[in-house]
From Swiss-Prot:
The keyword Zinc-finger does not apply. GO terms for molecular function: histone H4K20 methyltransferase activity. One of its GO terms (cellular component) is chromosome. Its main location: nucleus. It is found in: Nucleus; Chromosome; Cytoplasm. This is Histone-lysine N-methyltransferase SET5. Residues 116-400 form the SET domain. Disulfide bonds: none annotated. It comes from Debaryomyces hansenii (strain ATCC 36239 / CBS 767 / BCRC 21394 / JCM 1990 / NBRC 0083 / IGC 2968). It catalyses: L-lysyl-[histone] + S-adenosyl-L-methionine = N(6)-methyl-L-lysyl-[histone] + S-adenosyl-L-homocysteine + H(+). Keywords: Chromosome, Cytoplasm, Methyltransferase, Nucleus, S-adenosyl-L-methionine, Transferase. Its EC number is 2.1.1.-. Histone methyltransferase that monomethylates 'Lys-5', 'Lys-8' and 'Lys-12' of histone H4 (H4K5me1, H4K8me1 and H4K12me1, respectively), thereby controlling gene expression and remodeling chromatin structures.
Length: 493
């Protein structure tokens, strides 16, 4: 009886478990194949992603790793080298990698209210930069600023439309604060749509543009048959399109351009056009030359050139529909649209645009810390001295994670900002890697010697077993390993 119950319990428990595949693992065919060039490049990138230290390996070892992962692939060491060279992925081939820093242009920034401790210097090599007027001590607050153009999180668009996040800043609203009755009493709800603001401050900043972007009621056709400044219906369609395509840059430049054309002073537009500026299609060349390396390493998808251009043109047509008057005036060309997108992509911080901060150039070991609020994005940013800064020294920030390997940093900088970094940290990291390579050479010779010794021993003793003395004590513990590329058991209750 007990045995029957035990079997029933076991069967019941077994029903609660499911064997599942993870990481999209599929058994590879054992039939020999000649892989497509894209498969080879993607596999090398995957190796680098899993272990960044492998980026410094020579072609021979890299080829061996590819073959080890895909024994059925018919691919030579020469082909691997040729493909990496063609796609600009040889780490020792920096001179042949595509850069576009020389195509980035900027102008003197008009009407900028600079912090007391810094001034702008324009140089031929680094473009515009911020330099210390006097000595700045470590930890000093150098300046703080609000966004020139604030962009709410694209991911929160549906929450904003449903009154569950602030219409301006995108901050998630609590159940009590989003309650219709309470928001009406506080005057934070929109009297036309279902959107709500989180505070009077956000409502005051956003109320005019909110009405123009989202309500044709407040933006009727002008008399005389002239076109609208902003077509709200077209904007709402573009907003949904951006969410569907996860196209943050198009979403952002639409909000930026709406701010520019409604700014009666005209200063915002001049300041945006004075920033470091490059066309998005030029930036794409760097991505394409890397076989989409950066995008693949970030888990994204790479469009082929024709698909990408089609997407840009679709986005451009939707952008034009939002601003019919600007189209009539000839203010929006496809070229200008591409420049706006490129400008946004190389200047934004946390999706927003800051005026003074955008003048900071890069260093992998920066002398400033730029801090943004993780809870209240509208609080802007604060810039502190990371160490003592000399008078006349350039202020720098880091565009990438300094903890990345030098190859990862170089790749991100080249693709996203168009230059190969030559800072002191990069030079030292490369020297350190070279020293490690040199020190590993004697170890390789020792390995060869051990193999020769074992071969000689085998010749002497033939098939006899070798007895090895077992240590009387062993304090180590073998590290447990789990493979995550095949099958695991998941509880389904």
């Amino acid at each position: 009886m007990m045995e029957t119950e035990s079997k029933a319990d076991t069967a019941s428990l077994a029903n609660k478990f499911e064997v599942v595949d993870i990481n999209d693992y599929e058994a590879e065919s054992s039939e020999p194949i000649v892989p497509h060039e894209r498969q080879i490049v993607d596999d090398v990138i995957a190796i680098w992603k899993q272990d960044p230290s492998t980026e410094t390996l020579g072609i021979g070892k890299l080829h061996a790793m590819v073959k080890g992962r895909h024994p059925n692939w018919s691919v030579s060491e020469k082909r691997v080298k040729t493909l990496l060279k063609n796609f600009g992925l040889l780490t020792n081939n920096a001179n042949q990698q595509f850069t576009y820093a020389n195509e980035i242009k900027s102008l003197n920034t008009p009407d900028i209210d600079l912090p007391e401790k810094v001034h702008i210097v324009m140089t031929a090599k680094r473009g515009k930069g911020l330099y210390a007027k006097n000595k700045i001590s470590k930890g000093d607050l150098i300046w703080e600023e609000s966004q020139l153009f604030y962009i709410a999180p694209l991911a929160n668009v549906n929450l904003i439309k449903g009154g569950k996040a602030c219409s301006y800043c995108g901050k998630l609203l609590t159940q009590s604060s989003s309650n219709a009755g309470i928001s009406v009493l506080k005057g934070l709800d929109c009297n036309v749509c279902s959107e709500i603001w989180c505070s009077q401050t956000c409502k005051k900043i956003d109320s005019q543009l909110h009405g123009m972007l989202k309500h044709n009621l407040y933006n009727p056709n002008s008399s005389g048959g002239s076109k609208k400044l902003i077509n709200a219906n077209a904007y709402l369609e573009l907003q949904d399109y951006c969410l569907k395509e996860q196209w943050n840059a198009l979403y952002a430049i639409t909000i930026i351009y709406a701010n520019i054309i409604t700014d009666k002073s005209g200063i915002k537009g001049k300041q945006f056009r004075a920033m470091a500026r490059v066309s998005q299609d030029v930036r794409y060349k760097a991505l394409n030359s890397s076989a989409g390396a950066f995008d693949n390493l970030q888990g994204g998808a790479l469009f082929v050139g024709e698909q990408q251009e089609k997407l840009w043109k679709d986005g451009y047509n939707r952008f034009k529909n939002v601003f019919p008057k600007s189209v009539d005036n000839g203010d929006i060309s496809y070229q200008e649209f591409m420049y706006m997108m490129g400008t946004y992509n190389i200047n934004n911080l946390d999706s927003c645009i800051y005026l003074t901060q955008s003048h900071l150039n890069h260093n992998c070991d920066p002398n400033t810390n730029v801090e943004t609020s993780t809870t209240v994005r509208t609080n802007g940013l604060k810039v502190f001295a990371a160490r003592d800064i000399r008078a006349g020294e350039e202020l720098t920030t880091t565009y990438v994670n300094p903890a990345y390997t030098v190859q990862q940093r170089q790749r991100e900088l080249r693709v996203n900002w168009g230059f190969m970094c030559g800072c002191q940290k990069c030079k030292e990291d490369l020297k350190c890697q070279q020293r490690r390579k040199s020190s590993s050479a004697p170890a390789a010779k020792d390995d060869k010697g051990i193999r020769e010794m074992l071969m000689d021993t085998k010749k002497e003793i033939g098939d006899q077993e070798i007895e090895l003395e077992i240590p009387s004590s062993y304090d180590g513990e073998r590290r447990k390993s789990v493979r995550f590329d095949e099958k695991v058991i998941a509880v389904s209750e």
